[in-house]
Regions:
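Conserved interdomain hinge at the start of the Helicase C-terminal
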Residues: 266-295
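Conserved pre-motif I regulatory segment
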Residues: 11-50
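Walker A/P-loop
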Residues: 45-65, 671-683
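Core catalytic lobe of class I
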Residues: 351, 440-703
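A conserved SF2-helicase RecA2
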Residues: 363-432
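Conserved helicase ATPase core of P-loop NTP-dependent helicases/translocases
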Residues: 291-293, 301-302, 308-344
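Conserved P-loop NTPase motor "coupling/switch" region that bridges the ATPase
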Residues: 75-76, 121, 138-222, 380
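Conserved Walker A/P-loop ATP-binding site and its immediately adjacent core
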Residues: 59-64, 74-93, 160-165, 295-297
Length: 721
């Protein structure tokens, strides 16, 4: 038991500190108290992420972190930053009196020219570059700095509308790989090409986990510090919607919705109207600075003709030109800057400009947020005016942005709560619960962890065991670390499963069987990089054989591939895929019942004298074609809780009935370590056996208890008459 409890501790996801402690007096005197707190925390962790909103001094914090790492290691630190930010970062270092002799600041594009093993520390400025998890840049960063002892990631928006992107930071900081994080905290929402989202049960635990290796704040108050000097000015979001000329679309009005496919063509069709609106706004404020954000090069060309004094920074410009003009605007060398968000929306400080115009809005919340934050940041003295030029044909773009903003604010709120919990040391790995039991002459059921509860069963007391184990990462039942479904990968699942089946071998009578219901599992391209099947039944077979069971038989249960296709939208089952490239097609995935036997003396054999030849031939078929998938205990949906995800439907009573009939005697004890809503125990009691069942999830346990009371009541009525 001690080994098992130690294993459970390893499932509690925390970040192990690998850094060093430092006193406030040793830090740069220009820092605010909250900044010193963050830098000390990052230095102690060794590998850390700072998700601080714009204007909170990320540049100063990363420079001082780098300075202290240089002193501690007597080595060098590399800061990777967007091109336009490199110059500002160096200027900030000089401004605050930081020794830059061992701190090198270069842009991401120079990564191929860097000898990485010369650095003791690495800083990723605007680390949201990691969001492109399949990109070459991310791959190079992960590989090149894998063995760098000190790492820091800094950005304002780690994941504006997709918390999964936080996993890229986790992987960079050597906390948990992206695939491990997907298995532990995320679920694949139908189909083999669908996206991943946070499991309902995992939301709180995920943000608490992130809070062990990062800090997120939108203001100092989020981590308990005073707001003196950190009050933002008013932000005016001014939407100017243009009604476009009527088009020949066969409808009374123009289409109000666009997609990513026709987005660029729509911009070209509305270019004149939108840019005329831009020019009108700028001419109304002839003495004020403006940033104009565009999407297409043609927009920049036309604006340059309409506004000759403006300076445009394009992607095709030389690095020297970009750097000179982006810094020049910050230094008030000209008053109108035309550029794209992908060029200048990260890292630049444009407090000298309180007017921005989005000449063309797209679906990217992060681009919009980062661009606005160039001007709307702590330290800005004037109210900020953001002009959003939209058209009646692109109404869904603004709706998408609004939705993503809500997601971002939710993430900020959850992260702030988790960080505060972590700061006070009050994070719990699992909800504490008491074991609940219901015991009578027909059944003994308990609510709790089956690995711990099975310790109380007597040696060789079980005549038959029937169960369907948690399918590793496929389904999620609860937020407990004891839940085998909450595993970061299959190795972790099998390690925990092994603790159970060792005990199962002990409690099984000699010569008796364990029946495991399972299936092979689909591999999603979005997670593994390819589409295929995982041999889950093979993993179970290997695990049982390793503890001493004999692999005795396998029953295949037919399932309708049409139903599977409609439910999962699996690429391999789609008819259009057969016509496109049938090498990617596959058959439906059947269920299996794996039969394992404990060898030894057969002092109490199972003699099925009532089993007819016809029925035996039906049971002996290697494929059971006639299992009624609708014949299950009803009401299992009532056992679902608010945050529950997908669940395996209860095991079919037909299957359980045949296994109990074939492999046990009346009066035997039938055991299931994963009781669910009580199907195996229910059928055992109905067939005059005693049932023992364990279930971790309270709502399922309560439903099982009700189901078992009903079958006992039914037996009493049958006996009475």
């Amino acid at each position: 038991m001690t080994n098992y409890l130690e294993f459970l501790k390893t499932k509690q996801k925390t970040h192990i500190s690998s850094g060093f402690d430092i006193n406030d007096e040793m830090l740069n005197s220009n820092m605010f108290d909250f900044q010193k707190f963050i830098v000390k925390r990052a230095l102690k962790a060794g590998k850390y992420a700072i998700f601080a909103d714009c204007g909170l001094g990320k540049t100063l914090m990363q420079l001082e972190w780098s300075n202290q790492v240089c002193k501690h290691t007597n080595g060098k630190v590399l800061i990777l930053a967007p091109l336009a930010v490199v110059g500002q970062t160096i200027q900030e270092g000089i401004k605050f009196g930081i020794d830059m002799s061992n701190i090198e600041v270069v842009n991401y594009e120079q990564l191929d020219n860097i000898v990485v093993n010369q650095y003791s520390g690495i800083v990723l400025d605007e680390s949201s570059i990691l969001k492109n998890y399949e990109g070459a840049t991310k791959k190079d960063i992960l590989e090149n700095f894998k063995f760098t002892p000190y790492k820091l990631a800094c950005t304002a928006t780690p994941s504006p509308n997709d918390p999964m992107e936080l996993g890229n930071h986790s992987e960079f900081l050597d906390v948990m790989t992206r695939n491990e994080m997907l298995s532990m905290y995320f679920i694949h929402d139908g189909g083999e090409t669908a996206k991943w989202r946070l499991k309902g049960h995992a939301t709180k635990l995920f943000y608490q986990f992130v809070g062990t290796w990062s800090i997120m704040l939108s203001k100092p108050m989020d981590i308990g510090y005073e707001m003196t000097g950190y009050n933002l000015p008013d932000l005016n979001l001014l939407e100017n919607q243009i009604i476009t000329p009527k088009r020949q679309n066969g409808q009374l009005f123009n289409d109000a919705i666009i997609s990513a496919t026709n987005f660029n063509s729509e911009l070209r069709l509305t270019k004149i109207e939108r840019l005329d609106e831009v020019v009108g706004i700028i001419k109304s404020k002839p003495n004020e600075n403006f940033i104009i954000w565009i999407k297409q090069n043609e927009e920049g060309e036309l604006l340059k003709k309409l506004l000759p004094e403006a300076v445009e920074v394009k992607g095709s410009d030389t690095n020297e030109w970009k750097k000179e003009k982006l810094l020049g605007f910050a230094n008030n060398e000209f008053r109108i800057l035309i550029t794209k968000t992908k060029i200048a929306s990260f890292g630049m400080n444009y407090q000298n400009c309180n007017n921005q115009i989005f000449a063309s809005l797209d679906f990217s919340f992060e681009g919009l947020y980062q661009a606005i934050r160039r001007s709307y940041r702590f330290g800005q003295k004037n109210e900020v005016n953001i002009y959003l030029i939209t058209t009646d044909t692109m109404s869904n773009v603004k709706q998408a942005i609004d939705y993503k903003q809500k997601q971002f604010l939710l993430m900020q709120e959850e992260m702030a709560k988790a960080v505060n919990l972590n700061l006070s040391g009050s994070i719990m790995s699992s909800k504490v619960f008491d074991v609940i039991q219901e015991n009578n002459e027909w059944y003994n059921i308990k609510r709790g962890d089956s690995v711990q509860l099975i310790q109380d069963l007597q040696d060789e007391s079980i005549g038959l065991s029937v169960f369907s184990p948690p399918f590793a990462e496929l389904y999620t039942y609860s937020n407990h670390i004891e839940d085998m479904g909450n595993s970061k990968n299959y190795n972790e699942f099998l390690t925990q499963f092994n603790f159970l089946i060792k005990e199962l071998h002990r409690v099984m009578m000699q010569g008796r069987n364990v029946c495991v219901h399972c299936m092979d599992l689909p591999i999603q391209k979005g997670k593994e990089g390819f589409i295929g099947l995982r041999d889950f039944s093979g993993m179970i077979l290997k695990a049982f054989e390793e503890v001493g069971f004999i692999y005795a038989s396998r029953i295949t249960i037919w399932k309708d591939p049409v139903v599977e296709m409609q439910r999962t939208k699996a690429l391999g089952l789609l008819h259009k895929q057969v016509k496109k490239d049938s090498t990617m097609s596959r058959v439906g995935i059947p269920d299996y019942v794996m039969i394992f036997r404990k060898d030894g003396e057969r002092s109490n054999p199972v003699k099925n004298t009532d089993l007819s030849v016809d029925l035996w031939q039906k049971y002996a078929s290697p494929v059971w074609m006639d299992i009624n998938y609708g014949n299950t205990l009803q009401g299992y949906r009532n056992g679902r809780e608010e945050n529950d995800e997908k669940h395996i439907c209860p095991l079919q009573l037909d299957t359980i009935e045949r296994l109990i009939h074939l492999y046990s005697n009346k009066g035997d004890t039938v055991f299931t370590p994963f009781m669910g809503i009580g199907s195996e125990v229910y059928q055992a009691v109905k067939m005059n056996r005693k049932g023992i069942g364990f279930e971790l999830k309270e709502s399922y346990y309560d439903l099982a208890k009700a189901n078992l009371k009903s079958v006992v009541s039914l037996k009493s009525q049958t006996t009475l008459f």
